[in-house]
UniProtKB/Swiss-Prot annotation:
It holds the Pfam family Inositol_P. GO terms for biological process: inositol metabolic process; phosphatidylinositol phosphate biosynthetic process; signal transduction. Its EC number is 3.1.3.11, 3.1.3.25. SUPFAM superfamilies: Carbohydrate phosphatase. It is an enzyme of class 3 (hydrolase). This is Fructose-1,6-bisphosphatase/inositol-1-monophosphatase. NCBIfam families: PRK12676.1. IMPase activity is inhibited by Ca(2+) and Zn(2+). In contrast to mammalian I-1-P phosphatases, is not inhibited by Li(+) up to 100 mM. Its cofactor is Mg(2+). The gene is suhB.
Length: 252
């Protein structure tokens, strides 16, 4: 199967159908609750239905933020977040994406994260590098004098101490897409140790970051392990280097 073609076709159809809802609270409404307890807005449901239209005929396992798990006993599992950054989307904040991760026998195989408003396709096949619209990308070199990170506040970390270690702290509100910003060298790191992140948030960008040279660990600095479901919450650190990772771990 040509997973890149499938993912891009889904992304472009979702884009066509949901962008009229961007920033339009008056047009959106809640249609249900996801397996993890989050409210499902109509644009989430529209996006998921489009993805399912493509995927169900393939008879693969499916994990989706809104639906949960469809187990077809396949060697292939597709993990999707129809809209990464739903809060941003409905509030008119231009930072949200479609996430499409493919696993073979539970191992990362292909990842696609599509940033709608910049029309940016981040993607990677295992062992073949990471790309942004066909251009190869990699994490930037560590520079202690110019560290820019995205961080989700936690009582585990002293924010003032963190600010003394880095030049800029940002919170963008779409973790999977933020991971891609590490992969392309815009951010040095993104991390969340509350824990709040789920597999659906990171499945597509995980392989993109790994192929771009990023380190992805848990709060102890061990390589991140996660199950392919829509409910488990994770602590995750994504860093461009061992030096950056050590700075974050020293704060925990």
């Amino acid at each position: 199967m040509k997973w890149d073609e499938i993912g891009k076709n889904i992304a472009k159809e979702i884009e066509k159908e949901i962008l009229p809802y961007f920033g339009r609270k008056d047009k959106s409404y809640v249609v249900g609750t996801s397996p993890s307890g989050d409210e499902t807005e109509i644009f989430d449901k529209i996006s998921e239905d489009i993805a399912l239209k493509y995927l169900k005929s393939l008879n693969v396992n499916i994990v989706s933020e809104e639906l949960g798990v469809i187990d077809n006993s396949s060697e292939w599992t597709v993990v999707i977040d129809p809209i990464d950054g739903s809060f941003n989307f409905i509030n008119g904040i231009p930072f949200f994406a479609f996430c499409f991760g493919v696993f073979k026998n539970n191992e990362p195989y292909y990842g696609l994260t599509y940033e709608f408003l910049t029309k940016s396709f981040y993607e990677a096949y295992k062992g073949k590098g990471a790309y942004l619209n066909g251009r190869k990308i990699k994490v930037k070199d560590f520079n202690p004098n110019n560290i820019v990170i995205s961080y989700y506040p936690s009582k585990k970390i002293d924010l003032e101490k963190l600010r003394n270690k880095v030049k800029r702290v940002r919170i963008f509100g779409a973790f999977g897409l933020e991971m891609c910003y590490v992969a392309k060298g815009t951010l040095d790191a993104v991390f969340d140790v509350r824990p709040k992140v789920r597999a659906v948030d990171i499945a597509s960008s995980y392989i993109i970051c790994k192929e771009a040279g990023a380190l992805i660990t848990d709060e102890n600095g061990d390589e991140l392990k996660f199950d392919l479901n829509a409910t488990d919450r994770l602590n995750i650190i994504v860093a461009n280097s061992k030096e950056m990772l050590d700075i974050i771990l020293d704060l925990l």
